[in-house]
Amino acid sequence: GDEEHGDEEHGDEEHSDEEHSEEEEGPVTIRLRTERTEAEVAGSNPLPGFEQFKVRFVDTSYKHTEFEGDEVGTVFESDSTNTRVELKHNSWGAWQGVFGFQYTDLDFSAVGAEAFIPNTNTKTTAAFWIERGDFDAWQIDLGLRYEDVKIKVPNTLVLEEGPTGPSSDSDFQPFSASAGTIWTISDAVGLTGSVSYAERAPGVEELYANGPHIATQVFEVGDVSLSKESTVHVEGGARLDLGRFSGSATVYMDQFSDYIYQSDSGLEEEGLPVLVWSQQNADFVGAEVELRYDFEESKFGHWQVFSFADVVDGELSDNTDVPLMPPKRVALGLDWDKGNWTANVLWIHAYDQNNVAELETDTPGYDLLNAELALNGSGQDQFEWQIYLKGQNLLDESIRNSTSYLKDQAPQIGLNIIFGVRVFF
């Protein structure tokens, strides 16, 4: 897929490079453009033993320009082509599945004072197999994927102008395998379980970053010696469906080898904290619970009340906490519809996040209240429209996102009301 760099909201943050300290700069803004072209061809009985084929081609062009006041700062461009071929084989008894091939060619470039990643070309070739077997009360899912990832960097120096640095090539062969099952004990009760092994090649940013990343207000330093990241994922769950009442619960564990993450070095460069891409083993454990009650429809409309909770904890092999972990959350919501009208209210309570990495600050908890009211309509030829009024952060809380390095500089947006129209055709 595309690599999008720096498209987060910037607000009115001031650029703080020391080399420009003598001149006052305007607010940082961005202008972005994305063009996407898709084509798909499908047919039947392409080869003996296969009942269906599908070929999908996607071409995506992405460009965004960062402005400092009225002056162009840095231009990021990403052009990618993705070709995916799928062959669905004839049924093997209770088994149905797909063999596939995928090829992606991605060119990325950044030009300007804020470029922090060198120009790169990434070619990814992959073969995969997905299979599903249905055996009365049991459903079994299997999957395999093999990739070859080649990254070419003509010039590893990240400079607006000046000398040319050495080129660099990286080559990785990630492999993944998974197996999962769903056991339908009855119409009301089901159990799920899965285990997977997955490898991931380090990304361009993780390998080659070296400069100020204005979108996150940090100075990023990559590590070209990073190796593949791998994880063993084990998950178990249960679902309950008693008609109007339903619920589900999931627990999971991830055991990473050579987990890739950013750590705060404690140093500063150009007035920004230096974050270094590193890797070491890590373990994650987490759980999620969802509950819903569907009230009988009445003259007052159709009401549903729901709640969810989630928690995850991550620890590195040196017994320190994984940086930027999300907080524990509990939530309560209400959905309503009557005729062409729909509405919803959602309250989320996030607890304090005190399990933080070295040099990372604690993040206070918060209460987030959102609501939306919408009128829906339709016309001819699948034309649909929606007029909506949406309120976000209705309690006007100061919300800090523990998963962002910007949390100490930029809280999330306060109380805001949005009126809009959506059109679908």
Where are these regions (language model features)?
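Transmembrane beta-strands of outer-membrane beta-barrel pores
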Residues: D59-K63, Y103-S109, F135-A137, Y146-K152, ...
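Outer-membrane beta-barrel translocator domains and adjoining extracellular loop/strand segments
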Residues: P27, E40, R56, H64-V72, ...
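C-terminal beta-signal and adjacent terminal beta-strands/loops
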Residues: E199-R200, Q255-S257, L375-F425
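Outer-membrane beta-barrel signature, preferentially recognizing the C-terminal barrel domain
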Residues: E25-A39, P166-G180, T184, A188-G190, ...
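Face-selective signature of the C-terminal outer-membrane beta-barrel domain
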Residues: I30-T184, G190, S196, S248-Y252, ...
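Gram-negative outer-membrane beta-barrel transporters
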Residues: G97, S246-F256, P273-Q353
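Outer-membrane beta-barrel strand-turn architecture
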Residues: G43-G49, H89-G93, R132-A137, W183-D187, ...
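Residues on the lipid-exposed face of transmembrane beta-strands in outer-membrane beta-barrel proteins
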Residues: A39-G43, T83-H89, A127-G133, A179-W183, ...
